[in-house]
């Protein structure tokens, strides 16, 4: 939107009695803003998504303990359920996390049951790289299309056939 934000984010700020002037946002294009993060003196850094190289992890760990993706789960492969589980562990409330996952899953099933046309419908979770001028699709290994499969949809055959173990595939 015109605030370089989203309408829902702006609405939540307003609900909290805040404005964009009350918050600080950091660009991540060149990696984490380590010095700025350190100034905030966080108790923990919650970073379950993204490209967490050993170098980035070390620098962040020098600032605060870092919660990353679960062991064995690649970057951008973390499901929303795993994010909630990691948050529950971090906060010392694993049972609350489990309850939230169960309640949300139930609500999703109830909501999607109203739309029988979703079951079995194919989808492509795509992206456009402006700099490279390429069009691609995230695969089932990536967390971004998981919402669609949670709704009962299936990955488009083209993506499945051309992706193998990749997280994304170029479309042509």
How should each PLM-predicted stretch be described?
Residues 1-36:
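A short, structured surface patch at a secondary-structure boundary
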Residues 3, 44, 50-53, 72-75, ...:
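Solvent-exposed loop/turn segments at secondary-structure junctions
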Residues 8, 32, 36, 55, ...:
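Extracytoplasmic/secreted proteins, especially bacterial periplasmic and envelope-associated proteins
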Residues 26-33, 162-172:
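Short helix-initiation/N-cap motifs at beta->coil->alpha
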Residues 26-28, 47, 69:
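Short beta-strand and adjacent tight-turn residues that come in two discontinuous sequence segments
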Residues 37, 41-47, 65, 172:
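Proline-aspartate-enriched helix->loop->beta-strand connector
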Residues 63-131:
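Extracytoplasmic substrate-binding proteins
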Residues 137-169:
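Alpha-helical, coiled-coil/dimerization segments enriched in small aliphatic residues
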